[in-house]
Amino acid sequence: MPPDPRAAASVPPASAAETLAAEFRAVHRAEPLDAHGQPAKSEADLRVAQFEAGATALCLSGGGIRSASFCLGVVQGLARRGLLARFDYLSTVSGGGYIGSLLAAWMYRAGGGAIEVEAALASRERREGDVLDTLRRYVRYLAPRQGFFSVDTWTLVATYVRNLLLNALIWLPLIALAALAPWLVATIVDGVNAALPGADTLRLAALGGSAASLAGLLVGIFMLRNAIARRPTQATGAPGARTHRHIQQALCGSALVLSASTYWLAFAEPDAFWQQLIGTARHVLPWLPVDPHAQPPLLLGLLFIVPHAYLGLAYRSPLLTALRHRVAAMVAGGVVGFITGTAIGWIMTALAHTGAWALPIEAYMTLAPPAFLAAVALGEILFAGAVSRFSTDFDREWWARAGASSTILCIAWAGACAVGYFGPPLLDLVVSWRAGVPTYWIVVALAGAIARLLLRQERPLDRDAQPRARLRVAERAIDAAGALALFAILAGVAWLALRMLDATAYATTLLGWTVAAEELPFSWLDVLAVGAALAVVLVVAGLCVDVNRFSLHGMYRDRLIRTFLGASRARHPTPPWPLDETPPLSEAAQFAPRNPDDFIQFDRDDNPVLRWLAPGRASGTPRKGPFPIVNAALNLVAGRNLAWQERKAASFTFTPLAVGSPILGYRGAADYAAGAGGITLGTAMAVSGAAVSPNAGANSSPIRTFILALCNARLGWWLGHPADPARVRRATPGFAVYPLVSELLGRTDETHPWLFVSDGGHFENLGLYEAVRRGCRDIVVVDASCDPDRNYDDLGNAIRKIRIDLGVRIERAGPWRIGGRELRANGRYCALFDVIYDDERSGSLLYVKAAVYPDADNVPIDVLQYAGRSETFPHESTGRQFFTESQFESYRALGEFELDAIVEGVEMANRPDPTMPASVAEFVEIAAIRMTE
């Protein structure tokens, strides 16, 4: 029976070293020892143990169905030489994972393990229903039967539309609520203005708001004072960052309340009470101006003296010790407060002035709060200058960062108001019949013409730079188009929210539930009613819609399972270990012939639970073949490690023993999704191939992320954090709002209880990283990635990250003769590298690359014929997932041919069959000999 998942999940996650040690025992049937013969405890010691054990790895790269086809041919070539079963590890990514998962499931189900699978792959005899025959039938794995009226095609469309609409039940209310937030502020300001007709009551509301704003400012300054006082003793930045967020919240609240107060005050015409109050003030302050619109700013400046003087008095600095210096800082703070308060008052009074040029309330509420924050930032600048003789570089950096935060808040508020207030009218203008249609086509035509001219007229410095220069221009054009599309989407949602407000206002008018309004056609009650309805929809949808199952992942995974895992289903002998029959699971069905549903052609038993593939489930049984490692990427788009701001991802692996990441720890494969029966091989394969994803490691960008998430172009998967036992057991988040918002905004990180995992190529696309982490002595990498320009980006990326993270150097050990068709007959299909673990241990890496040389010997004619039809072969776009029979066979045959070409003509002495390498090491040695010819 499998281990109790609850008991397993109650312990902390295993470290990377503990997990690798368990793997070593499962693969080598021995205890890992370090260089001194002691039990290996660290990752470095475990690499020594693996190296001394002669560990080997086969790595199959990402690249979708293109990579799967090519890797299948290479694997067949290895099988014909008896090498497949000799690998200890099978490390796969994305498309390589299709074939890797097929092999893992096949070896698990086959009684003879890898030996039986090798024999089947090596055979050139073709039988109806065998693995290769099944793969050919389902080579268009997403929609096997092509055609416009194909049920497979329309099933994809129907599934996408269904999932898109269900996800829209979350993001539509969410964006609409964000668009309504500025309207709520505006309607409250407008409603108070309309509900208080008398100047006295309106002015009283304004004074009350000003007092509340001043209180908020005092709270912010008090927290700032405490932060300054504690700052020298803080060991980390976390408390300071948290305090600064509280200060920002206080300032934002003060900005909104003071903006409203100034607006109300501008509408309160001078009366006897106000004139008497100002007269009394002028007796005390004879320089106070007579103009009533000039008096509030000066009074506000006087009010700001007190808190800023307190800030100056509370200011702490190693250079500020003498009493006179502290008094000077207090005076400087008071002066800065007066200037800041007066500036805020002047700006807001000018914006809200009721003269002929008075702004609409929407424009006023867009500009006034940022003006308040800008004035506060100005005060910070002036104060920093006033106390510059007593401040340190640390202080000045702190003030600069505070100013930057205020700037970000200003931009964010202005952007939200621009979408909420002005997006709908602009959209009305664009789509109106009289103005919109010509405007639309003019914009499209101009954008297309400009983009085409830029692409044509770009004049690079040299011809080799031309494609890259054009690519950069195209990327800029795409970014600009994406930004425009994003604004249109947000404005469209705001337009819908505004129409809902209009309808609600009409309904409340009919029912007699009206609330006073001055400028706007609806009231704050209407906004709250619509907001409450949207919030209910958001909460209900967040609880009911599964963020994992209603992405595109399920559709993608089910079709991969049918094609690659279903291909290995046949009647196999019952294995010699106790079968897992825990409901709803039935391991016995894995060894029965496939029995798909007649209508959808899916069989739920095609997909084995990942933990079932663990080696050594019965004592005395032979190892079932290479230990599978399915590589994925843990997305860290908003991660905390500043050194990883380019990569934005970390390694995440699925194996039959453990699931997790070296930076977070690992949980047993039996623990993950234990509440749903356990994580499956099909899920791991699909996550590893989740190339289309809003958060995609180094490929992530804010606009791309937002639009892909809105369009539900989401193949990734949310998994529980290894450190959170409760969530590890669950298959999916219980509330979908936070995960979807994290995908929309690119806020995925390593700290939240739910982690977003996607295509392994978003971190490292060859599978080499984890093979080197395990200290393998001989590694064969099959690279079928899309690389038409032969930049070898994936190889360079892997070597760089391995050197940075693991301290292992990979250096070229022979000639480099891999290239394009221009090499004709002089090209090679592989290159050799040294994997330098330390001064005493150096392994070998054989890098096999998909390439075509038209004049090379013995290239299959059908491969050359297809290469003549496709100029980019064998580097056709990964986006082409609907392969034809000729495409599939051309890539498969090329992989098989390359493996033959690498070892052809070299014979090893003292072998029963001198053309058959006795080990992976000998195979690499043969390849090295061939490269020197």
Q: Where do the language-model regions lie?
A:
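Catalytic domains of lipid- and phosphate-ester/thioester hydrolases
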Residues: 1-933
